[in-house]
């Protein structure tokens, strides 16, 4: 007897943990000026992969929970709420393009690679645009920081997300191809 809900929840937890580990231990901090650092990491690859395999709800929650916990435990507590929202949107964007626009589940191998690449690039573009805006609004309206500081932080965030997007998309496509014939042939979640 197979319980798909338990399998789905287990995979979501695994992807959240992988995103957490990538942020916590595999990030590269780059000085960006103004006393700020940009964080470059491949954790988005696991959010993308979760959204492709598990669909919108679990994929979006995977990224939101995994990277929000990483922020909290790494000492970036005030970054956790914007991280939750922006990573949730990243997962939703990837799942929407892959499953609603292109119907990834019905695609053959060659077409699936194109769909995965397009969905991953679209999701990362959404993240590069929305995350700086969310962080700017949060810093100005919730934390009460001056506009100039919030603006510099948003620019820093946009650059970090754009640079992180490239290896994340590449890794997500390769990982999807690797698990396509194992996990995906055994379990259909979407």
Please name every model-derived segment.
Residues 1-190:
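Loop-helix junctions at membrane interfaces
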